[in-house]
């Protein structure tokens, strides 16, 4: 969606500017209405007579018009709803109130959103707004004007719920059973979303006799989506609590199946909703193409989820078959993927241990050990097939004559992919870039989003960006740091965190204006007294020091005779 990507990347319209403009318009409209009522007393009597003669409100909703027609508030509401301009001001004020409530709830629950979460939420919100506009063009098209406002109110409630649900689902991906302090607010928010979804369903069941069956089915589709998503959030909060932290493998298994079933059911409901809108749209027009396109998107999402599930199943079977399940000897050791206590884990050939599900998610992205980057066999190597090159369509014309003109026979071959012809591959879309960005951020949360996105646009692959980070070509790296900062930091880390039985070898530079001292691993150090993490950290420090000394920035050190 080019329009959605353009709006989501631009700084306008921002929420602050929209709220300021809405407050200004609401103040001007309120002053105008109250001035009109004060300057024209006969207007109140006219509206009162009009309300008493309006039998539609009393018959449809059972309101006591005789008692309500004398109240000034009810008269002002009727005056606003009867005016074409003021009714849109009222609807816009309603949307502004929902936006303020959404921001307050997000502020109280999550405090501040990450930049990536804000961008993804902004793009999802604009997608929902575009879908709602097309949705209303089909639903409200053949109906009268007084039916517009209920549909707009319903669309605002659905947008309010879907935005909170989307942000909560994004945050729940990073919730761990170890952090129970921040998850309490998310639990209260999940209960609020669940009860609002149930209230929406109850409200539609009460007023469905005022609607025909086609709009009622569409409203029930919205209710089902809200209920399924709220139920998913509620169960995720329950499973992430400390009550079930004693069995993390069962919790991960439950969360995986819960997310898979919820996503599949929600995509199916959305596809059925688009199919109904396509069936009852007024003729074949652009909206029909729009609904067909989104039906194809939802179908592709469902097939991708099933394909991803089959791949995960193969990887999990490979893990259970190839790597033994062991009990961690040290109760304080943690998995380097999720940073939870190891407990029962899987041991790789390089002797590193990880949880079953952590190892499965890792092998789905990379066929190497998360700690030492040692290559390990994975079924993903067989699943990943190189893209077929050379797919083409061949058109054959046998020739012929038209009057006195003779056309020779020729063959036209059209290639399916013009990327190699122009010397470059197809650039990834924004959706693919966001997916790859999430994969890289799961492994390197400390990295800046801008740095990762810049490298992804150049490499076009999450695997290439991960290798660039690990090999030090981007990010906070030794080869990009000044010499003084690097030496001082490595000296502090070596002296504070690594202790050896024997004295460490101290290397000093000659007296040429500066003097540096750093700690180096001794060949006779007692590694048995150090933890595995400390040993690997010391090796990593030596590796990066060696890389720095081999770089161009260390030419002055090599000239002094310092080569290791």
From Swiss-Prot:
Keywords on record: Glycoprotein, Membrane, Metal-binding, Transmembrane, Transmembrane helix, Zinc, Zinc-finger
Primary site of residence: membrane
Membrane topology per record: Multi-pass membrane protein
A single BP term in Gene Ontology: protein K48-linked ubiquitination
CDD domains from the UniProt entry: CUE_AMFR
Subcellular location(s) of the protein: Membrane
GO CC annotations on file: cytosol; endoplasmic reticulum; membrane; ubiquitin ligase complex
Annotated CUE domain residues: 432-474
Glycosylation sites (chain numbering): 53
Gene3D superfamilies: DNA helicase RuvA subunit, C-terminal domain (1.10.8.10), Zinc/RING finger domain, C3HC4 (zinc finger) (3.30.40.10)
Transmembrane segments: 17-37, 61-81, 86-106, 123-143, 148-168, 185-205, 215-235, 272-292
Domain of life: Eukaryota
SUPFAM superfamilies for this protein: RING/U-box
Entry keyword Zinc: yes
Keyword rRNA processing found: no
GO-annotated molecular function: ubiquitin binding; ubiquitin protein ligase activity; zinc ion binding
Function field: Proposed to have a role in neuroprotection.
PANTHER family hit by this protein: E3 UBIQUITIN-PROTEIN LIGASE AMFR, E3 UBIQUITIN-PROTEIN LIGASE RNF8
Protein name according to UniProt: E3 ubiquitin-protein ligase hrd-like protein 1
Species of origin: Caenorhabditis elegans
Lineage, top ranks: Eukaryota, Metazoa, Ecdysozoa, Nematoda, Chromadorea
């Amino acid at each position: 969606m080019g329009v959605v990507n353009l709006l989501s990347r631009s700084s306008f319209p921002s929420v602050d500017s929209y709220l300021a403009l809405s407050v200004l318009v609401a103040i001007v409209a309120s002053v105008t209405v109250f001035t009109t009522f004060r300057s024209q007393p006969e207007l109140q009597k006219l509206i009162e007579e009009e309300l008493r003669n309006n039998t539609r409100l009393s018959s449809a909703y059972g309101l006591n018009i005789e008692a309500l027609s004398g109240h000034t508030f009810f008269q002002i509401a009727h005056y606003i709803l009867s005016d074409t301009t003021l009714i849109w001001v009222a609807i816009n004020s309603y949307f502004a109130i929902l936006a303020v409530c959404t921001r307050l709830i997000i502020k109280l629950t999550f405090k501040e959103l990450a930049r990536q979460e804000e961008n993804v939420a902004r793009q999802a919100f604009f997608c929902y707004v575009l879908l709602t506009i097309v949705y209303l063009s089909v639903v409200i098209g053949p109906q009268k004007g007084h039916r517009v406002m209920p549909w707009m109110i319903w669309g605002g409630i659905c947008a309010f719920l879907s935005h909170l649900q989307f942000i909560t689902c994004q945050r729940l991906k990073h919730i761990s059973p170890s952090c129970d302090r921040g998850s309490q607010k998310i639990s209260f928010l999940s209960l609020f979303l669940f009860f609002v979804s149930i209230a929406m369903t109850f409200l539609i069941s009460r007023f469905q006799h005022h609607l025909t069956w086609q709009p009622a089915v569409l409203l029930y589709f919205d209710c089902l989506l809200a209920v399924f998503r709220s139920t998913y959030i509620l169960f995720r909060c329950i499973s992430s609590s400390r009550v079930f932290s004693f069995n993390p493998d069962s919790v991960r298994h439950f969360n995986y199946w819960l997310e898979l079933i919820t996503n599949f059911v929600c995509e199916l409901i959305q596809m059925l909703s688009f199919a109904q809108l396509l069936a009852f749209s007024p003729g074949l027009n652009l909206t029909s193409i729009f609904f067909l396109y989104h039906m194809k998107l939802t179908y592709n999402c469902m097939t991708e989820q099933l394909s991803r599930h089959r791949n995960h199943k193969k990887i999990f079977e490979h893990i259970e078959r190839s790597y033994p399940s062991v009990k961690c000897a040290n109760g304080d050791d943690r998995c380097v993927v999720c940073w939870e206590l190891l407990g029962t884990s899987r041991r790789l050939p390089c002797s590193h241990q990880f949880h079953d599900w952590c190892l499965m998610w890792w092998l789905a992205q990379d066929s190497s050990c998360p700690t030492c980057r040692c290559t390990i066999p994975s079924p993903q190597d067989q699943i990943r097939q190189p893209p077929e090159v050379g797919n083409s369509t061949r058109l054959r014309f046998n020739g012929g004559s038209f009057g006195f003109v003779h056309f020779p026979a020729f063959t036209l071959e059209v290639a399916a992919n013009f990327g190699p012809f122009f010397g470059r591959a197809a650039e990834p879309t924004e959706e693919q870039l966001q997916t790859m960005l999430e994969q890289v951020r799961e492994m390197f949360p400390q990295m800046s989003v801008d740095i990762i996105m810049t490298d992804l646009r150049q490499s076009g692959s999450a695997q290439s960006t991960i290798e660039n980070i690990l090999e030090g070509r981007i990010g906070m790296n030794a080869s990009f740091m000044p010499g003084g900062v690097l030496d001082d930091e490595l000296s502090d880390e070596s002296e504070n965190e690594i202790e050896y039985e024997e004295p460490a070898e101290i290397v000093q530079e000659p007296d040429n204006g500066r003097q540096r001292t750093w700690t180096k691993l001794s060949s006779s150090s007692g590694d048995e007294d150090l933890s595995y993490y400390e040993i690997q950290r010391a090796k990593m420090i030596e590796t990066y020091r060696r890389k720095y000394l081999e770089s161009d920035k260390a030419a002055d050190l090599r000239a002094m005779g310092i080569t290791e």
